[in-house]
A protein has these predicted regions:
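Charged, amphipathic alpha-helical segments
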Residues: 11-14, 137-142
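Short runs of predominantly hydrophobic/aromatic residues within well-ordered alpha helices
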Residues: 151-155, 222-225, 282, 286
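Catalytic DNA-binding helix-loop module of base-excision-repair DNA glycosylases/AP lyases
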Residues: 205-255
Length: 297
C-alpha cells in the first residue's frame, strides 16, 4: 500500500521507494508530488525523515498521513489505482502500427467479411489501403454528415477499423438488420454530436447513451460502442474526443481485466485529466497508451 507524507509547509507527497545512491551508497528517499504535474523528487533518507527548526519550533520535515487525506485534493490521474506508462507523450496522433504493410490482420478479416456477405458494395474499400486510410475516410464522412442522412457506411467503416473482434453483430443472433439498428444508432450519434465540451454532465449523458445502446443492440459491447462514440465525437471535439474503452485500455489504465460501462465515466474522467496535465488531446493520448501496451505484451 502506498504511503503519503505531508511536508511541513503543507504540500503532500507519495513515497515511491527507499533506495541507495548508486555512487555514495547512502540511503535516499524517492517521492512524488501529489499536485500539479506529479514531479518526482529525491532526498537523503535522514533529511526526509529528519526534523526541521522553523520559527523556534522543531517539527518533522515530513509527517505521514492517510490515503484519504492525501488524495482529497490530488489530481485524479495521480491516484495510485490508475496507471499511465512512463513514456514521452507527444501531441501528434501516431499512425497505426505498420501502415505500409496494408491492413492489419483483424481489419483485413473484417473487410473480407463485409465484402463476402455483401454488406457493402465491391467498391466500398477502393482507395483504402491500410487502417489509417479507413480511419480518415470514416472521419471525413462524419464531418460531412447531416442528421437524417443514412449513416450505414460510416457504421461499417468504424466496424472495419475496429477489427475482427467486432464481427459478432454480423454473424450472431438473427444476423445484421440495418433497418432495426439505424434508429438506435442515430440516437447514439445525436448524443455525440450534441456534445460540445467535456464536463461531468456531458460524460454522464454519453455514458447513459452507451448503456442504452448496449442494452438494445446485442453482439457489439462497450468496447466497440466506444469506438463509435470516439469517432463521432471527433466531429465536435476534434483531437479531444473521449477515448475508446477496450480490454487493452481497461487493463493498462484501470488495471481491470473486464470492460463494462460501470467504470466508463471514471475512465473517461481520469483520461481527460491526464490529457489536460500533459497538454495534449485525448485521441493521441489513447493511441500512444494503446500502442505502448501492445508493444509490451
Amino acid at each position: 500500500m502506498a504511503e503519503y507524507y505531508r511536508h511541513f509547509k503543507g504540500k503532500v507527497y507519495r513515497l515511491v521507494c527507499v533506495a541507495k545512491d548508486s555512487e555514495t551508497l547512502d540511503k535516499i528517499v524517492v517521492y512524488q508530488a501529489m499536485y500539479d504535474d506529479g514531479d518526482v523528487w529525491v532526498r537523503p533518507y535522514d533529511e526526509f525523515f529528519g526534523k526541521v527548526d522553523r520559527d523556534g519550533m522543531v517539527r518533522d520535515r515530513f509527517t505521514k498521513i492517510g490515503e484519504k487525506e492525501a488524495l482529497e485534493h490530488a489530481p485524479l490521474y495521480l491516484h495510485p489505482k490508475y496507471h499511465f506508462p512512463e513514456i514521452e507523450y507527444k501531441a501528434e496522433t501516431p499512425t497505426m502500427l505498420n501502415p505500409e504493410a496494408g491492413f492489419s490482420r483483424g481489419v483485413k478479416a473484417m473487410v473480407s467479411l463485409l465484402l463476402r456477405r455483401n454488406l457493402v458494395d465491391e467498391s466500398f474499400f477502393d482507395g483504402l489501403f491500410n487502417d489509417d486510410d479507413i480511419e480518415k475516410e470514416a472521419i471525413r464522412q462524419i464531418i460531412s454528415y447531416h442528421p437524417g442522412e443514412d449513416p450505414k457506411n460510416i457504421f461499417h467503416l468504424i466496424q472495419a477499423w475496429g477489427g475482427n473482434s467486432g464481427r459478432g453483430i454480423y454473424l450472431h443472433g438473427e444476423g445484421f438488420n440495418w433497418n432495426v439498428l439505424r434508429p438506435k444508432y442515430e440516437t447514439l450519434i445525436k448524443a455525440c454530436i450534441d456534445t460540445a465540451e467535456i464536463t461531468d454532465e456531458s460524460i454522464a449523458k454519453l455514458v447513459k447513451a452507451v448503456r442504452s445502446f448496449d442494452r438494445s443492440v446485442h453482439h457489439l459491447g462497450v468496447s466497440f460502442i466506444t469506438k463509435h462514440v470516439r469517432f463521432w465525437l471527433i466531429r465536435t471535439l476534434g483531437n479531444n474526443a473521449l477515448p475508446i474503452y477496450d480490454s487493452i485500455m481497461a487493463n493498462e489504465v484501470m488495471r481491470m481485466n473486464a470492460v463494462n460501462s460501470k467504470h466508463l465515466a471514471e475512465y473517461w474522467k481520469v483520461m481527460a485529466a491526464k490529457a489536460k496535465q500533459l497538454g495534449i488531446g485525448l485521441v493521441p493520448l489513447e493511441r500512444q497508451i494503446f500502442q505502448y501496451s501492445l508493444g509490451t505484451r
